[in-house]
């Protein structure tokens, strides 16, 4: 049972035993083993409280985390709680017993992309489809300061519609990890997919490193083999550093040009995500508006996730709220949250009233979310309303630029709190 009904840690389900014999936490019926890794196993399960919907549950042994893997698990929770995108595996809940941590995730029923590409190369048309979906997910992550750092077919899954789902964010880096020189400094990734600048053991740009890995994935999809291969690891690194690869004869001229820019060894000259969106091969046969897909800012306002579960509350709260799992934790956004018993429509109307009083511009608006811009559009705040229960909603205000000294944002925050009832749940500002 939870230790204290008044503590934020009570949101995490902790039980006295390891597993309920009939159903995990009285909710999930564990099924077959889908796979296992260095410190976790993944099972298929049925959500008994949601009509038997199939989910995937990653089970992490806490005792394995004593070997320095705690940061790895913390990072995966921190990253995945930020991400809601159609081509990224959704993490819906985190539960714990005395000995295990359970990640409840969306089940990608189509399996690994790797298993399909190893049996046969893809056509350019199919390669283009998956590359577009990959770039859509990568663009979304980068807009939120998240760099995957281990993009490879084994971490690219397929759903029941054969659409792409990016998974395994255990090696991901966030903007909070960037050094004063503006670079990341941790060597991560799988050798055949790592960018050449990572091999220099100096600082590197996480977004540029991800783009290189996307290039390796695209090469593999089209060719059926990796661009850089050598039985000797140092020989492999030399080929990566010099970008020595041979494209198959069937590769079209436009694809050759794109791969050349993706696998550019100089990160300063490497193609960017925004440039990829304008590339002729990338755009072939599709309306440009369909390619870009969900814009980063637009997805902040999407209805997806409008009903909060326990995991949303844990992960959006202050650092102490995850101590029931494994200690201190850092909240990445400057965020203010409180609970109200007013309707969403009433709250949204009041937000607009306050915005008008403060001369703020409504940049974007949806039923449960609104994006406000200050003078000259130099900063913005997103206000979202998500349902907690039949009677209560959570009002969340995020300063996207994380500028805690923004005067108009502070004024907006104070006015909203006074206007939309006295808050009963408040996330403290990050020190």
UniProtKB/Swiss-Prot annotation:
Residue span, Protein kinase domain: 28-282
Record's signal peptide: none
The UniProt record lists the keyword Thylakoid: no
SUPFAM superfamilies, sorted: Protein kinase-like (PK-like)
Chain intervals for the UniProt region annotation (PPI): 333-363
Catalytic residues, chain numbering: 150 (proton acceptor)
Gene3D superfamilies in UniProt: Kinase associated domain 1, KA1 (3.30.310.80), Phosphorylase Kinase, domain 1 (3.30.200.20), Transferase(Phosphotransferase) domain 1 (1.10.510.10)
Enzyme kind, highest EC tier: transferase
One Pfam assignment: NAF
Gene Ontology terms, MF aspect: ATP binding; protein serine kinase activity; protein serine/threonine kinase activity
Cofactor: Mn(2+)
UniProt binding sites for ATP: 34-42, 58
Superkingdom of this protein's organism: Eukaryota
Modified residues (Phosphoserine): 172
Stretches for region Activation loop: 168-197
Keywords per UniProt: ATP-binding, Kinase, Manganese, Nucleotide-binding, Phosphoprotein, Serine/threonine-protein kinase, Transferase
Family label: Belongs to the protein kinase superfamily. CAMK Ser/Thr protein kinase family. SNF1 subfamily.
Domain commentary: The activation loop within the kinase domain is the target of phosphorylation/activation by upstream protein kinases. The PPI motif mediates the interaction with the ABI (abscisic acid-insensitive) phosphatases.
Function: CIPK serine-threonine protein kinases interact with CBL proteins. Binding of a CBL protein to the regulatory NAF domain of CIPK protein lead to the activation of the kinase in a calcium-dependent manner.
Name this polypeptide is given: CBL-interacting serine/threonine-protein kinase 22
Origin species: Arabidopsis thaliana (Mouse-ear cress)
